[in-house]
């Protein structure tokens, strides 16, 4: 009974001082001290006094500023980026930004502008990026031209513009990006384009405008970085209108909801009169496709035929000898050989993703592509019991291979011996059957990145990753370990060059203290979404300066002896753990507040215990674990009782002694 009373006494003594101090600051979020702030969607009608004068980057969208003038932002003279998206701005008065000499980006997207003064943009010495998307502009005369000499990008999408004719004094010399997408531009004249003559290597976007006519010679002798006429139903209009022009990239893709004309071989002859390096024709249909369909593509280096309903390409096609990149994703091939790879002798990059039908690899279908460096065959339901030597025959220069999101693949020893130069191999979400005692990757001496996410591997095979001397990035997410434990001897011991290791969602319960002992070069370790306790932190004691993700585990109390291990890391994520916020964990809670600069996900790092603090951020908790006033009172009473007890005990002993002399 005395023991129970004393325990109760100490509980009262030390728990009476536990309390939480929280702050619910609804004002702007500081992203970088004194420089970057987010004030989005706070219902503000003016700049808060809490923002420092040194603010450089301000996100102020979804507030209420119907009128802005030269006093609205005058205090923030160091602004370089200002986002005023959907602030219901109607009026921008004279000299609004006169004191903002360093402002380079101004976002006015989604504001129903009625008036912009001629001098409203005066002040910034190097305004480079101006966003006027969804502002109701119907005429380019609305845009004030003063002080736009250094403008590099102008975004005018989703307005009511029907003519791209700029004012005569519009400064286009430094313009690099001009975006007119989703307007009402149906005709482009020579006079319209004359105002852009000074712009060199311009990226011009007419996507979603349904251009129906281009005056002959409008693009004559012009040079563009990119041209986008996406969603144009009749491509003949574009090919005829772009005669004698030069562009690095021409985007002519369409969309599923647009009823456009099929592409004919005759239509593509318009490319003979222009110079193009990259062409996108996605979502179109070919009325006929023959060996001469692409005969005008002699200068083409990149071709995107995504979702063009192709079932095969004829052999002996002309005009594609210089092609280096080919995209054939979302088509209807039955077998890889149907692409007639011999048509593309210079090809270095091939992408066939998401084929509509189950794709069969065949044997040696790509052997004519001896220069191929990148091959993406993901999301194709590919299935093979013996992969991949015969299928990838003669691809000795291949550096990147993506076989992710496919059906089960069987891998023999040296399964990729035809691709000894591989640097990146992605097999994520493809069930692998390893049919050999040795590693299927053992000849890949240059492999740096290996993605084995959810491959259902036998992780007890200690030789699985043998023969990868320069592997730097390994993703084993979703592969479970026997008994939920990574033991001292494990499959990671053969990859000592690792810098990034991802072991999230592996069902881990514990990690042996010596499990990572051979991995001394690691800089990034992801152990999130497991069931690890704080004891597993010991396995990281030899690592310093790493990014450590321990989110969503079973960590509650972190003992003081483990804090030095955490202190020596650069970034730590402990969010979504059932952390204890009582005095039993006071050393960790103190350390946490002292190291907030190292912690990621602090908004989601909350208390789970005691119930009164559940859901409260650790950074908002303040515990008082010393002796409180109530505790002192009880202590005095306890000591007084103890003194009385001792007094009577001594008195009793003395009386007993004298009685027995």
Curated annotation (Swiss-Prot):
Pfam families, per database record: LRR_11, LRR_8
Gene Ontology biological process: B cell proliferation involved in immune response; cellular response to lipopolysaccharide; inflammatory response; innate immune response; lipopolysaccharide-mediated signaling pathway; positive regulation of lipopolysaccharide-mediated signaling pathway
Topology, Extracellular side: 24-626
Superkingdom: Eukaryota
Residue intervals of the LRRNT domain: 33-53
First and last residues of every LRR repeat: 54-75, 78-99, 102-123, 126-147, 150-171, 174-195, 201-221, 275-296, 299-320, 322-343, 346-366, 371-391, 397-418, 421-442, 446-466, 470-493, 497-518, 521-544, 546-564
Xref: SUPFAM superfamilies: L domain-like
Name of this protein: CD180 antigen
Annotated organism of origin: Homo sapiens (Human)
């Amino acid at each position: 009974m005395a023991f129970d009373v004393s325990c109760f006494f100490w509980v009262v003594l030390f728990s009476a001082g536990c309390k939480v101090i929280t702050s619910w600051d609804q004002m702007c979020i500081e992203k970088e001290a004194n420089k970057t702030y987010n004030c989005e969607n706070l219902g503000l009608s003016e700049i808060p006094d809490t923002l420092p004068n040194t603010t450089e980057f301000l996100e102020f969208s979804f507030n209420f500023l119907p009128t802005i003038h030269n006093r609205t932002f005058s205090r923030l003279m160091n602004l370089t980026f200002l986002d005023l998206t959907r602030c219901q701005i109607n009026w921008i008065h004279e000299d609004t930004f006169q004191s903002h000499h360093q402002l380079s980006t101004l976002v006015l997207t989604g504001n129903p502008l009625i008036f912009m003064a001629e001098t409203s943009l005066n002040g910034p010495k190097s305004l480079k990026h101006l966003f006027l998307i969804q502002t109701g502009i119907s005429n380019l005369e609305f845009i004030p031209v003063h002080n736009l000499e250094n403008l590099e990008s102008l975004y005018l999408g989703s307005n009511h513009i029907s003519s791209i004719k700029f004012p005569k004094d519009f400064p286009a010399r430094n313009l690099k990006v001009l975006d007119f997408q989703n307007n009402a531009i149906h005709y482009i004249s020579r006079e319209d384009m004359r105002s852009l003559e000074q712009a060199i290597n311009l990226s011009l976007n007419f996507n979603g405008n349904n251009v129906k006519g281009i005056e002959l010679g409008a693009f004559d002798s012009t040079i563009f970085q990119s041209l986008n006429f996406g969603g144009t139903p009749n491509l003949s209009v574009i090919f005829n209108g772009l005669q004698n022009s030069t562009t690095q990239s021409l985007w002519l893709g369409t969309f599923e909801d647009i009823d456009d004309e099929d592409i004919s071989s005759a239509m593509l002859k318009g490319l003979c009169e222009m110079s193009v390096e990259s062409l996108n024709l996605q979502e179109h249909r070919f009325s006929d496709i023959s060996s001469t369909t692409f005969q005008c593509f002699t200068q083409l280096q990149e071709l995107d035929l995504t979702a063009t309903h192709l079932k095969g390409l004829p052999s002996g096609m002309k005009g594609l000898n210089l092609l280096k990149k080919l995209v054939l994703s979302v088509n209807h091939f039955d077998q890889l050989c149907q692409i007639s790879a011999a048509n593309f002798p210079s090809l270095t990059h091939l992408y066939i993703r998401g084929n509509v039908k189950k794709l069969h690899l065949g044997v040696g279908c790509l052997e004519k592509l001896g220069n191929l460096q990148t091959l993406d065959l993901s999301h194709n339901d590919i299935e093979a019991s013996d992969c991949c030597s015969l299928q990838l025959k003669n691809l000795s220069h291949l550096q990147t291979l993506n076989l992710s999101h496919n059906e089960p693949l069987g891998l023999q020893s040296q399964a990729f011996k035809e691709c000894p130069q591989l640097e990146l191999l992605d097999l994520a979400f493809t069930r692998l059957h390893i049919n050999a005692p040795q590693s299927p990757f053992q000849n890949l001496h240059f492999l740096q990145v290996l993605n084995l996410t959810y491959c259902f591997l036998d992780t007890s095979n200690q030789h699985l990753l043998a023969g990868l001397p320069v592997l730097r990035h390994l993703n084993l997410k979703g592969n479970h370990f026997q008994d939920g434990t990574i033991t001292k001897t494990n499959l990671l011991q053969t990859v000592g060059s690792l810098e990034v290791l991802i072991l999230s969602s592996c069902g881990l319960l514990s990690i042996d203290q010596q499990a990572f002992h051979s991995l001394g070069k690691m800089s990034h370790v992801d152990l999130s979404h497991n069931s690890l306790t704080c004891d597993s932190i010991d396995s990281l004691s030899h690592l310093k300066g790493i990014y450590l993700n321990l989110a969503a585990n079973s960590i509650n109390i972190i003992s003081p002896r483990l804090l030095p291990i955490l202190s020596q890391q650069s970034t730590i994520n402990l969010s979504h753990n059932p952390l204890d916020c009582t005095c039993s964990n006071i050393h960790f809670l103190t350390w946490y507040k002292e190291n907030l600069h190292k912690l990621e996900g602090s908004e989601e790092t909350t208390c789970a215990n005691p119930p009164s603090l559940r859901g409260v951020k650790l950074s908002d908790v303040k515990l008082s674990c010393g002796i409180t006033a109530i505790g002192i009172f009880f202590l005095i009473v306890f000591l007084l009782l103890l003194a009385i007890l001792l007094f009577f005990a001594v008195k009793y002993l003395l009386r007993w002694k004298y009685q027995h002399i």
